[in-house]
Amino acid sequence: MYDLKIYSSYIVAAIKDKIVFFSTDGAVLHTITVEQKAPVKDTDAGNEPNGNQTQPTPANVVTFEYCPTAKVLAVSLSDKTWRRYQLREEDGGKLCSAPLGEDITTARTIVSMKFVPKHGVLFGTDKSDCFEFGALDKTSEPQPKWILGHMSQILALAVSDDERFIVTSDRDEKIKVSSYPDCHNIECFCLGHTEYVGGIEIIPSEKLISVSGDRTLRLWDVTEGKELSKLSLKEPALDFTVQKVAEGCGMLCAVRSYVQNMVEVALVSYDKPDASELYDPLTIDESLIILNAGLSASLRLMLLTMEKESKRVRMLVYEFCAEKRAFKACDDHPFVKNFEDQFKDVTIEQVRDYSTLFKHTIDNLTEYFERKKIKMESKKSK
């Protein structure tokens, strides 16, 4: 279990039960270790303790989301609970935190989150449903409220800046744009992908960027569901991270590829869609697997990676060079060393399997025709 996200003031990394806040320059500001539940004593038929203890499911971080305005961190855990932490700045720029309320139990694990600060709520999705939580309400326990669903697995979640639209994408090629808070009112669908839609982001001028397993990156009008442009990627895409470039109306996209050591790079123009273009991809050492990627406002790319043999985690940092239209490695960046110090000898036992997202066609005739062909050829030879 792991995640990496970049906010305006912090870089946040989580692996297993540890969450670390870094400054944008890579300095360590605060660490949170998820408290594990105590073992439960078994009881016999007479409800008397029998001396045995049942170990609870480990509570490791699945994903998290931070709200800068309220300074609240919401964390989804692998034991089907999620927790909140209230953060506070101390002298010297360091942070401290305290649990906020009780653990909230959900029917299924929450796999993606987005804060909606104007409404004071958090959106969270499990496999096929999206829920609303009153995560910023400090006076009550935020029980989940169902707001929308899909017929297949939800893979990505985005919310417009004005909080009028919730956009969700799924394994069955669909991108759904729902009104908020009247989520039963579907504004439109963005249809055109032919494989799972792994990543979506709303950008300025009410535009939407999406990437898919069909090897395409697409730009949409989010209010009408109209496709504005399409770029052909080299490989299927898993997800992406995006930031606005300093000049013009362009968005730099770093697309995490199905090829485990590659990030594809694109510049998407939202005022002149036809001007969008692909740059040369970034390929790292074959001994590493890219687990997650984040792009900062200064166009600094952070890659959370894992060594294939040792399973140890590593952080890689790159700076974008506009003249060369490529990312350049920053091996001496402080974030690299500080990340290593915080997660030294931490290993990832299991990497997420994305092969299950692709369509599987059932063909009952191919084998039959092959056998028939062999049989006919054998008869001719006689």
Swiss-Prot record:
One of its GO terms (cellular component) is nucleus. Residues 49-59 have a biased composition (Polar residues). Its main location: nucleus. Pathway: tRNA modification; N(7)-methylguanine-tRNA biosynthesis. Coiled coil: none annotated. Pfam families: WD40. Keywords: Nucleus, Repeat, tRNA processing, WD repeat. One of its GO terms (biological process) is tRNA modification. Disulfide bonds: none annotated. WD repeats lie at residues 149-190, 192-230. Signal peptide: none annotated. It is found in: Nucleus. It comes from the Eukaryota. InterPro entries: Trm82, WD40/YVTN_repeat-like_dom_sf, WD40_repeat_CS, WD40_repeat_dom_sf, WD40_rpt. Residues 40-59 are annotated as: Disordered. Belongs to the WD repeat TRM82 family. This is tRNA (guanine-N(7)-)-methyltransferase non-catalytic subunit wuho. It comes from Anopheles gambiae. The lineage of its organism: Eukaryota, Metazoa, Ecdysozoa, Arthropoda, Hexapoda. The gene is wuho.
